[in-house]
Amino acid sequence: MSQFNAESLKYHLPFHSRDDIISMDTNTFVEVIYLRRSSSETRKKILTACVRLFLEQGYKNTSVSQIVDEAGVARGSYLNLFPTKDKILLDLTETMFDGQFGVARSIADSKLPSVYAYAVDTALQLTLTELNENLREIYIEAYTAPDTAEYIYVHTTAELKEIFGGNFPDYTDSDFYEMDIGTAGLMRSYMARKCDIHFPLERKISRFLTAELRVYKVPEEEQAKVLAFIQTLDIKAIATEVMYKLFAMLEMKYDFKLSRDGETEEAK
């Protein structure tokens, strides 16, 4: 019986204990490696298909049957890896929100207080959902589904504490986490309400930021300055650029090609 370096292999085979690895013969080890690689390839196919379909036709309109047909995998394999669509949405949400605040920081002058970057970030999210209905649906679902909402709360808590901690000197991470549950709910509600002639984007952004900044005890004078700064930006043009950069990032990660008119084609 061939023996293997269990200490090094256990990190690559987390679903096996050290003792299991030590006792493996060559054939068993090869089979485990094959199954793991096969599972990884199946997962990638499913994620690629899902992201394409979500962006092309919307989250709710994408069925399990469409996903498995697009991915070319068995329904059982799909359900084994992703019992619900929400599990796939979590992977997509992590990709979309990763580095999102960094984009806002690059737009806001680094010499300005970080509350300006926060305002830009939230204004961009609201604007993105007005530019693309499928993105609106993805964002709303992300703020609604328990796993993705939890990711957003945790992901945002540290930023909130860094930005607004001075206004709440006795608040812990838990306090900011609990506040974010409320403000994230506010964000979801504003995203869900589509803009129209009676409620234009500029008013939506202004109303939302005023409510948010009051929650975090930003002085009225500072609020006015932040809102004035946002009004100087061509937020639709910036959001459009951000949207296409987001699409490009998703194309690269999930290995597909999304055309600018919303149609997708397989990456060659």
Task: Locate predicted features.
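Hydrophobic alpha-helical connector segments
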Residues: D91, G102-E137, T144-A145, Y153-T157
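Helix-turn-helix
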Residues: K45, L53-K87, D91
